[in-house]
Amino acid sequence: MTPRGRFITLEGVDGAGKSTHTAWMVQALRDLGLTVLATREPGGTPVGEKLRELLLSEPMALETETLLMFAARCEHVREVIAPALARGEWVVCDRFTDASYAYQGGGRQLGAARVAALEQWVHPDLQPDRTWLFDVPLDVARARLARSRQLDRFEREEDAFFERTRAAYHERARSSDGRIRIIDSSRPLEVVRAQLDSEVRELVAQAA
């Protein structure tokens, strides 16, 4: 029987540097001899990518936004994530359900209970094995976004939205029993990478 793979997620508010480290982590795991699938949310499937376009560009009701996030996630879990894990692959995902707790539950003030109900429906038996939460103060995140591409609908939100989102992420980390590791990504890139390298190697050794 093929051993189950491991499921890694990367989280953080927009501008925290999360996506910068995703490709590096995928390559680091491959360099350790692992078969790795890189994916993202919303997205990861043809249906999910179409929903991503809507979610990042079109104004919509909070409830619609939340349900579309989980619709994309449902397709993603069933068609991509679960099959890859069953094949023994390691999956590295740029955002997962912690993002819904943070952005919709916290930023949009939907609350955790409704997000939890959808989580229980869509993937009751799947949780990441390890989540790295890239964390920066709001002013650092804003400065990074200002230097990037044209901003999407979420990235254009007001400061209060991002403060609530960041606070919700921290609450998730506190209640995660160590699954979520917070990375201070306001530090120099090489310092962050050194910490990640150590923690990735630790995770791989534990899985051996």
Swiss-Prot record:
Cross-referenced Gene3D superfamilies, in alphabetical order?
P-loop containing nucleotide triphosphate hydrolases
**Per the database entry, which stretches of residues form a coiled coil?**
none
Q: Where does ATP bind?
A: G12, V13, D14, G15, A16, G17, K18, S19
Q: Which residues form the signal peptide?
A: none
Enzyme class, broadest EC rank: transferase
Reaction catalyzed: dTMP + ATP = dTDP + ADP
Q: Which family does it belong to?
A: Belongs to the thymidylate kinase family.
Q: Which NCBIfam families does the protein's record reference?
A: DTMP_kinase (TIGR00041)
**In UniProt terms, what function does this protein have?**
Phosphorylation of dTMP to form dTDP in both de novo and salvage pathways of dTTP synthesis.
Protein name, UniProt field: Thymidylate kinase
The source organism is Bordetella pertussis (strain Tohama I / ATCC BAA-589 / NCTC 13251)
Name the gene: tmk
